Amino acid sequence: MSSIDHRHLVGIVPLTKPYSIYNNTWDDGFINISETVNAIQGAILECASAGCDSIWVNADYEQIPLLKKKIGSWVEDPIYYCRTFEKRPSLTKKYIPIFYSWNHQKDVGRRDSYGWGIINAGFVASKVAANISKHLLPDRFYVSFPFSVTNFWQPQHHRKKINLSGRLCFTHNGKTFLDNEMLSFIFTQEDLRSANRNVKEKGTGFYMPVTQGLNDPDWSKP
């Protein structure tokens, strides 16, 4: 069996801290972006459309019960929606499991951000998979943001490229997630470990808006 058979793409949907810019008592990701889909569901559908084998939502611990109730524990692979030629379509559907992770208590108020949520979900997904089988260990991670500008149905048209790629990122007007745009991207296990080391070595424990410098007096510890 070749190594390609063991490729495992895990979707990650990071949520921010539980306060809301709209003064809601729940995460802003629950806001509808269409009549039937909210922002979190849109991000999950994008992961499913990209061909993820499982999806991990990283959120504040207090939000997990509401997420489980509203989001559920699985999503259908949309590529099977239009297979009307199947004799029994209901038997050929693929269900992608949805799991939930949360930041450790010591990280709350210090590292609970989109970036750390991605790292945390990546490590939790890897640890759980490794405890089951080495063949389930994810080799790549697909990150989708709830407030992304990406059309969540679009990735299914690029599955071949996604499956064969290592690192990959969406661009818009020449910008990517590296420009602080909420655009989806794929990173590897090596990137995950490197990002974790970088946070531990260079993290300050401070919150700072992207446009502010280190010497700005307006930024402070949470």
Where is each model-derived feature located?
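Conserved alpha/beta core of the MobA/IspD/sugar-nucleotide pyrophosphorylase nucleotidyltransferase superfamily
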Residues: 3-8, 188, 194-222
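Generic secondary-structure transition motif, activating predominantly at the C-termini of alpha-helices
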Residues: 71, 75, 79, 89, ...
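Short, flexible, glycine/charge-rich loop motifs used to bind or transfer phosphoryl groups or to couple energy/partner
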Residues: 1-2, 132
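Conserved beta-loop-beta/alpha segment of the NTase-like Rossmann-fold superfamily
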Residues: 85-203
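N-terminal glycine-rich phosphate-binding loop and ensuing alpha1 helix
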Residues: 2-87
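Acidic-enriched, low-complexity/disordered segments with a strong bias for Aspartate over Glutamate
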Residues: 5, 27-28, 53, 60-62, ...
